[in-house]
Amino acid sequence: MGTIRYHLCIPHVDGLDEYIKKYPGRVVHSKYYRSPTVYSGQKVLTIGNSASGSDIFNELTKTAHLPVYSSRRRKSPFEGDKPQPGVEWKPIITRYHADGTVEFEDGTTLGAGEVDKIIYATGYRPSFPFWNERANGRPIYDYEVGKLVNTYWHTFFHDLPTLAVVGIEKGLTFRSFEYQAVAVARLFSGRNAIPLPPAREQRRWEEERTEWVKATGKKFHDIESEPGRLGEDSFKWLGYLYRLAGLGTLTGDGRVPPVLSKELLHAVRTIHKYPRYDEDAAGGEVYGYHGGSSTGGKHAAKDWVVVDGL
């Protein structure tokens, strides 16, 4: 299964339901975002500053009415100490008022006339509407805990040996999915280099991972997703899938998981996704990479690397 995170995730806020009814079409999810030109001249509030949210509010600075408001729980580690030009940071929304006012955690507000569109870039929840719990004897996902049930290595199931999931984890996105896909294909075609461990060892892995979650406060399927880090957890995760898959055939059939090259590792460990203010530059200009723009110098765009999904 690869159709995992698809159900829209919009957090509950007091007054949101009434606000949506009063202003139909004003609140949308980033799933339906296609082009910044749709929002030309509009006053936009975006919510969320992970990959999609950041891309959206940065694109909107070229077309929307400025500033573009960006509501977030905290500053992203990808960002500098100040918002980029054209963006104004706001804390989380605490209430939508009946008169159309949007109230934030710090007590500030945006009136009904100050917002034309609100874009929730708040991600997706795992969704398995096709899963027949009665026929399969159990649920596939525990929504209270936030994990696959009876999972091994975020991919396999110790009680369902012919089922696998690709894409539930949060880590080195896309690259890790590719490792999973190759490992699953090898296993199900009988060409895996090493066997899966016995069910009891798979259960032990799940139990130990659960204890790790309790000890660290992290999510079960999160694998070192902070920028600049690709350490023990990531190497164990990808390394096992690599060993399980093994090499392709002598004649070249079968994909080999792409290696973590020195260039990739350097990119991850020195990542800067958005421009930061150069206090030494005239006028406090920004440097770095975004949309191909740069003020030049030693921090020119060519010296920066963009790696999404960490």
Show which residues each predicted segment covers:
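Glycine-rich, N-terminal phosphate-binding loop of Rossmann-like dinucleotide-binding domains
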Residues: 1-3, 122-123
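Cofactor-binding loop segments of dinucleotide-utilizing enzymes, especially the Rossmann-like FAD-
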Residues: 49, 73, 168
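Glycine/threonine-rich phosphate-binding loop and adjacent beta-strand/alpha-helix elements that clamp
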Residues: 125-189
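Eukaryotic N-terminal targeting leaders
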Residues: 11-26, 75-91, 97-113, 141-144, ...
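Hydrophobic/aromatic beta-strand patches that form the interior of the parallel beta-sheet core
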Residues: 28, 45, 69-71, 119, ...
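C-terminal, flexible cofactor-proximal segment of oxidoreductases
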Residues: 164-310
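A Rossmann-like FAD-binding core segment of flavoenzymes
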Residues: 61-143, 187-243, 247-250, 254-255
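Glycine-rich dinucleotide-binding loop and its adjacent helix/turn
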Residues: 2-59, 66, 83, 146-153
